[in-house]
């Protein structure tokens, strides 16, 4: 532990009881640049200003040449700070980069930047007793040089931003209502569905807003080729659980157009440890009526129960009557196990968590630009 007592305790300037999922100002972010002169990513800079200086003709702004990630850091009972499966985020970040001609960020640099971003903002990691709250981590990379024609960019920027957050959704107690999206497809069969790029998300915002106005907390996508198979929710993965004659089976849609969710993978591993059967396969929409429980799963949503799924074109409404508040529900068992591992009150049998390193031992560069007020 460093002489100044790393990690710092949770800041008294933050009202930890009223966190949302909206950004609040922190100490700064980590930033790296890639230039053709050296053909590699440069050293990390700690930048206090949350605003980025980007040319208006940058391909990221004009052609959507950008990628992002989502991950979290948690404070443990001993006061240390843990990351959850960060190497999987590094792998997925490189996978996304391959779709949009961005030089891959080496795993070592990705992890170093994440450790620095969290470590230099350690007082913004929520207290251990604020269950469900965490420091949200948003790595991004984008083409930042000025390029008008659709051609390879020269310069790229990689950043890691952080902010303390509460869970995006608590599931409204007994679950959210989901609407099957019928007016727009999320991803084409040979498209970018497995990459975390903005183009997979921006087109669905209007549909999500309309659904919310109609009382739906989630929007569910079917495959774009036949509209018969379940893909995923607009901003999270799908998991279903079926209990039949005392046997529990977890079903997870498997398709090349689905984002490889780290939280979904973790839930599958946890389910297997319970002795449940886990099936990663194509899941038809009609099969949803056979499920006992259904969830939206992701870094932001964590594990959010679904109360009903409505499909207007067939006048179908599938309802789930499980008591999600029951300690015996699949929802409660999965959620408590995941959060217990993430926050350190259960043993990490899989070695998923990684303790954040003291940034004082890293020779990063500090930017002198102050944050704008």
Curated annotation (Swiss-Prot):
GO MF term (any one): branched-chain-amino-acid transaminase activity
In-chain residues carrying the UniProt-annotated modification N6-(pyridoxal phosphate)lysine: 196
Residues that, per the record, bind pyridoxal 5'-phosphate: 92, 232
Pathway(s) the chain acts in: Mycotoxin biosynthesis
Induction annotation: Expression is up-regulated more than 10 fold in toxin producing cultures.
EC primary class: transferase
Cofactor(s) named in the record: pyridoxal 5'-phosphate
Keywords of the record: Aminotransferase, Pyridoxal phosphate, Transferase, Virulence
Gene3D superfamilies: 3.30.470.10, D-amino Acid Aminotransferase, subunit A, domain 2 (3.20.10.10)
Single biological process term from Gene Ontology: branched-chain amino acid metabolic process
SUPFAM superfamilies in alphabetical order: D-aminoacid aminotransferase-like PLP-dependent enzymes
Coiled coil regions, renumbered to chain: none
InterPro entries, alphabetized: Aminotrans_IV (IPR001544), Aminotransferase-like (IPR036038), B_amino_transII (IPR005786), BCAT-like_C (IPR043132), BCAT-like_N (IPR043131)
Remaining remarks: Gene clusters encoding host-selective toxins (HSTs) are localized on conditionally dispensable chromosomes (CDCs), also called supernumerary chromosomes, where they are present in multiple copies. The CDCs are not essential for saprophytic growth but controls host-selective pathogenicity.
Function per UniProt: Transaminase; part of the gene clusters that mediate the biosynthesis of AM-toxins, host-selective toxins (HSTs) causing Alternaria blotch on apple, a worldwide distributed disease. AM-toxins are cyclic depsipeptides containing the 3 residues 2-hydroxy-isovaleric acid (2-HIV), dehydroalanine, L-alanine which are common for all 3 AM-toxins I to III. The fourth precursor is L-alpha-amino-methoxyphenyl-valeric acid (L-Amv) for AM-toxin I, L-alpha-amino-phenyl-valeric acid (L-Apv) for AM-toxin II, and L-alpha-amino-hydroxyphenyl-valeric acid (L-Ahv) for AM-toxin III.
Name by which UniProt lists this protein: Transaminase AMT5
This protein's encoding gene: AMT5
């Amino acid at each position: 532990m460093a002489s100044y007592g790393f990690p710092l305790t949770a800041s008294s300037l933050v009202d930890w009881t009223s966190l949302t999922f909206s950004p609040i100002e922190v100490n700064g972010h980590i930033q790296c640049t890639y230039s053709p002169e050296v053909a590699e990513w440069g050293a990390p800079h700690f930048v206090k200003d949350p605003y980025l200086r980007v040319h208006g003709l940058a391909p990221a702004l004009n052609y959507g040449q950008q990628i992002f990630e989502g991950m979290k850091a948690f404070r443990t009972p001993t006061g240390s700070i843990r990351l959850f499966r960060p190497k999987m985020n590094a792998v997925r970040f490189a996978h996304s980069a391959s779709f949009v001609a961005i030089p891959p960020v080496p795993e070592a640099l990705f992890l170093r930047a994440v450790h620095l971003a969290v470590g230099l903002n350690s007082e913004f990691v929520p207290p251990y007793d604020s269950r469900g709250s965490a420091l949200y981590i948003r790595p991004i990379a984008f083409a930042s040089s000025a390029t008008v024609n659709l051609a390879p960019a020269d310069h790229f920027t990689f950043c890691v931003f952080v902010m303390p957050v509460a869970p995006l959704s608590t599931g409204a107690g007994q679950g959210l209502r989901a609407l099957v999206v019928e007016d727009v497809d999320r991803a084409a069969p040979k498209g970018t569905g497995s990459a975390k790029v903005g183009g997979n998300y921006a087109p669905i915002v209007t549909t999500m807003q309309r659904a919310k106005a109609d009382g739906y907390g989630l929007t569910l996508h079917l495959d774009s080729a036949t509209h018969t198979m379940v893909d995923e929710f607009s901003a999270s993965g799908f998991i279903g659980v079926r209990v039949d004659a005392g046997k529990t089976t977890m079903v997870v849609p498997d398709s090349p157009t689905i984002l490889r969710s780290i939280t979904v993978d973790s839930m599958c591993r946890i389910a297997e440890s319970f002795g449940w059967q886990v099936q990663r396969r194509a899941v038809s929409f009609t099969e949803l009526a056979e499920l006992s429980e259904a969830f939206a799963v992701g870094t932001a949503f964590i594990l959010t129960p679904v109360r009903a799924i409505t499909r207007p074109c067939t006048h179908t409404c599938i309802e789930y009557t499980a008591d999600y508040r029951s300690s015996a529900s699949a929802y409660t068992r999965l959620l408590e196990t995941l959060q217990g591992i993430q926050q350190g009150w259960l043993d990490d049998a899989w070695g998923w968590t990684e303790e954040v390193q003291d940034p004082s031992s890293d020779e990063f560069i500090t930017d002198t630009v102050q944050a704008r007020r």
